[in-house]
């Protein structure tokens, strides 16, 4: 079984990157013993989706996430702190869809993301709902505000270090009650093991 395949997402969500980039993503996941499970169904073609990724407690989460993006050949924009976009790594992350943000002004970033995505026809946007690798009691509401602003459903993607699996979960439809939605999603993620469980 391959570690990951572009067939797990619709053609409309693929970036058509060079085969070498896709091979690199698959090979890195295989070398590390990881695989990507689940899929995004064809019923979501030409629709916006916010992909939330958790638990997030380590830089390894980002490495595995970028490898999965490459292996899936996913055309996805993902938000990351600006300090990660330095030197040559920054150029590569932007090539893979990364958007550097200044966490001192998150509101402006959210509004910019909403306006940008509104102009597109079917977009994947990746967000770490915790907003940090440190332990937090409650997630930030930014991903729900973005989902509401672009009329998007949510794909909960998990990174489980116990099983070495990245799972594309079933679609979550926001209810409009942010506190309830965050509580429900945090409950969903309780079964997954973080790289540093004490931070989650």
Predicted features and spans:
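Extreme N-terminal tail/first-helix region
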Residues: 1-37
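Long hydrophobic alpha-helical segments that form multi-pass transmembrane helix bundles
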Residues: 23, 196-200
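Soluble catalytic domains of membrane acyltransferases
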Residues: 3, 14, 34-191, 199-200
């Amino acid at each position: 079984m391959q570690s990951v395949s572009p067939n797990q997402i619709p053609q409309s969500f693929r970036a058509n990157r060079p085969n070498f980039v896709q091979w690199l993503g698959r090979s890195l996941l295989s070398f590390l013993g990881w695989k990507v499970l689940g899929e995004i169904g064809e019923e979501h073609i030409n629709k916006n989706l916010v992909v939330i990724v958790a638990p997030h407690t380590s830089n390894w989460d980002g490495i595995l996430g970028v490898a999965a993006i490459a292996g899936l050949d996913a055309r996805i924009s993902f938000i990351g702190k600006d300090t990660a976009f330095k030197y040559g790594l920054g150029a590569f992350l932007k090539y893979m869809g990364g958007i550097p943000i200044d966490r001192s002004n998150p509101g402006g970033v959210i509004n910019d993301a909403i306006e940008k995505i509104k102009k597109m026809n079917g977009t994947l946007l990746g967000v770490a709902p915790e907003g940090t690798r440190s332990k937090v009691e409650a997630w930030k509401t930014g991903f729900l505000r973005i989902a509401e602003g672009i009329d998007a459903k949510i794909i909960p993607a998990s990174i489980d270090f116990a099983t070495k699996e990245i799972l594309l979960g079933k679609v979550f439809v926001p209810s409009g009650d942010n506190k309830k939605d965050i509580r429900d999603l945090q409950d969903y993620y309780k079964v997954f093991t973080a790289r540093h469980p004490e931070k989650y």
